[in-house]
Structure formats: C-alpha cells, structure tokens
Amino acid sequence: LALNSSIDYTRIGADDANSLSGPRYWRNLRFTNNIFEISSKFELILFQISDLGGTGRYRTNMDVFAHAGISFFYHNPKGSKNGYSWVNLRPLKTEGFSYKSIAFATPIGGGINITYNRYTRFGLVLNYRQTFTDYLDDISTVFADPNNLSTEAAELSNQYIGPEESSVNFMPGEKRGNSKNKDVFFTLSLTYSKYFMGRNPRYRTYRYGRNSY
C-alpha cells in the first residue's frame, strides 16, 4: 500500500450541437473548463510481475494497481454564443445564484506501471472523479428569469434554437440541468517517472529468492 500525491491540470468541455438528443441540441449551450487539482490517493498493488518477459535479468517489472483518495480543485467554466469568444460564466450567475470555484472530488481508478532498469517508470492511469459540485458546466437547475439577469448572462443562459412549439420547455423555471446528480469526469493519463534514489545497497529488494539489484 502506497500514498500518492499529485498536482494535475485537466481541460474539459462539451457542446450541445454534438448531442443526438433533440431537447439538448435545442438547448444549444457549450462550455469549457480548466481544472487545477491537488489530490492524495492510496494505491494498492493488485498484481505484480517482477521479471516481465522472463529474461532472468529482472530489469523490467510490471505492477497493476487500484487507487482511491480525495482531491480539491479550482475550476472556472466558460461559455460562448459562437464557439470562438469565451466568457467566464461563474460571475454572471446564469441560473440566478452563485457557486464556489473550489470543490472536492473522490478520485477512483487504477492503472499499470512498468519499471525498466529499476529507475525509469512508464504508466497508464485511468482516473474517475466523482465531484461534489454540479457546476463544472455551469448547468444544474432551471432557466432563470432573464429580467433578473444581466444582458450578457441572459444571452448566455438561454440560447434555444428549437421549434417554436417546444420553446415553452425552455422558459423561466423549466429544467435546464439535472441537480440530482453531481458532475463526474474521467481522465486517461500516460505517466513517466525517474527515480533518483535507491542506488544505495540499503534500498535493494529481493524477488523470487534472488537480489533484483
């Protein structure tokens, strides 16, 4: 069992124009969000091969692991009317009230690490984050009354492009998002590590009855 702490940058985004759902396509909203995250995770090795390839030289090792932990992050969703000019959404209060730019998440996932020649490591890591905010995309509850918003906020909050007979579903008080479920996001990362300690004999380890160093 090991403890791993990291600082990560992730950029997420979506566009209703790419949706196959009619109502969501008509909603016509889009966002992008830069997320800066600090996390600590416990890692548990599930499976280990100490001599990958069976060469007998013990130069390449492989670890399969799972992890879980907690993180906090700063995020800043931006919206656009044309997909080119982006505006910070949080200060605009597009649903009529504010939310925090700092939030927490529980990262859960796993991956594979391959260590070559004891000091160089490559990894592939899948990370699922269940957050405690519903505003990564600035969309959570219902459409606000445009009379209670600034002109810019009203324009970005409701960009309906559907048929006229369905416009009633996008009026103030109607569903804009789903506040019952908090936001989640996934990342798939390639990692590289270089060890600068461990050349001292005191760090030697033994596998399969022989000294691997």
Would you name each region that the model predicts?
Residues 40, 66, 108-110, 126, ...:
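Membrane-embedded beta-strands of outer-membrane beta-barrel proteins
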Residues 43-45, 111-113, 193:
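Transmembrane beta-barrel domains of outer membrane proteins
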Residues 64-71:
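Hydrophobic alpha-helical segments of small multi-pass membrane proteins
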